[in-house]
């Protein structure tokens, strides 16, 4: 589930929309795709989302950075990358 949400966001740096606001997103992929780091920052605002994602033999593991998992999941479910991304 989380993997599918992350796959909808392009690797590298991109822009998109969440909750009517523009976000700058940086997504990096490591370990042959088994590890993903994502940082999103509201353009002109103070909101941000930060996470690490791991896919192991035991399944998916979401590790939010200094925030509740629900905030991260809400962002991933609602974020829409710009068409040019």
Give the ranges of each region predicted by the language model.
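Short beta-strand micro-motifs enriched in acidic
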Residues: 28-30
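Negatively charged, low-complexity tracts enriched in Asp/Glu with abundant Ser/Thr
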Residues: 1-26
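Intrinsically disordered, low-complexity regions
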Residues: 13, 17, 45-46, 60, ...
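The AdoMet/dcAdoMet-binding core of the Class I SAM-like
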Residues: 84-85
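Acidic, aromatic-enriched beta-alpha/helix-loop junctions
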Residues: 33-73
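C-terminal partner/receptor-binding element of secreted or periplasmic proteins
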Residues: 74-81
């Amino acid at each position: 589930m989380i993997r599918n949400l992350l796959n909808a966001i392009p690797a590298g740096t991109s822009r998109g929309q969440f909750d009517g606001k523009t976000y700058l997103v940086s997504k990096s992929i490591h370990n042959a795709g088994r590890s993903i780091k994502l940082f999103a920052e509201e353009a002109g605002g103070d909101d941000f989302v930060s996470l690490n994602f791991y896919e192991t033999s035991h399944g998916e593991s979401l590790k939010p950075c200094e925030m509740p998992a629900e905030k991260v999941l809400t962002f991933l479910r609602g974020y829409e990358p710009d068409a040019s991304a």
